[in-house]
UniProtKB/Swiss-Prot annotation:
Keywords: Cell outer membrane, Lipoprotein, Membrane, Nodulation, Palmitate, Plasmid, Signal, Transmembrane, Transmembrane helix. This is Nodulation protein NolT. The lineage of its organism: Bacteria, Pseudomonadati, Pseudomonadota, Alphaproteobacteria, Hyphomicrobiales. It is a lipid-anchor. The chain crosses the membrane at residues 233-253. Induction: By flavonoid signal compounds. Pfam families: YscJ_FliF. One of its GO terms (cellular component) is cell outer membrane. It comes from Rhizobium fredii (Sinorhizobium fredii).
Amino acid sequence: MFGSAHGDTTSSDTSGRRPLRLVVLPLLLALSSCKVDLYTQLQEREANEIVALLMDNGVDAVRVAGKDGTSTIQVDEKLLAFSIKLLNGKGLPRQSFKNLGEIFQGSGLIASPTEERARYVYALSEELSHTISDIDGVFSARVHVVLPHNDLLRAGDTPSSASVFIRHDAKTNLPALLPKIKMLVAESIEGLAYDKVEVVLVPVERSAQEQRSLLEPDLAQASRPIPVPLLAVAVGVGAAVFAVTCYLLFIVLGHRRRQLTGELSRVQERPGVSALAAIRKKIPALGRR
């Protein structure tokens, strides 16, 4: 009898582990929702802007803060290509610019006048490009500065000039700011005249999905599909609930079966007593059937 009881216990433990696996596996699948890194080493402000844009277009994006103060954007692996195209159309992440301090930091070597002049021109271009990129509606901007090396002893000097390239949202009335942009560039460079600044504006149309989300925000919100990670979590939770229910039912039936087995064993030890009759006494419902 002891051997039989030990065998029943071992079988019960082994069988009880299977429902536990059914509970744990869906939860693990739900928690590991196939998130991949979209962009890393981002500043917090730009990372929040990217997350807001992705979520407005139906992408479940997550910002993960790093120990160095930068942020990482994670999205579902299936939406990685769509997210990259969407952000590229918006000029995100923005190009990083160097400031004057980074360009002229001490290198320990004596630079030639030509090298110093090249650094100065490059620094002016970077600073102006960064400033223009901060204008609302501007996706990207580049400023090219030309500072000719004129001889003070010679007449007919070549004037300085600058060219500005701006890629912006077509919905933004950036042409209205054109005089101010030219004035900004002219006043930032010594010896540069206003009429020597040329600005090229390149408007970028919104995608059909973005236009629909802007014109019909309520409809877009109502018809937005459930993000894949949330759907995986819902399926995992439902499977976990079903597995727990099956596990509890399995325990109840196993306990009931062990009770009947114990009753049958005790009846078999009594001489002259019918096993079926003893069980019917214990379970009146079976006798009535």
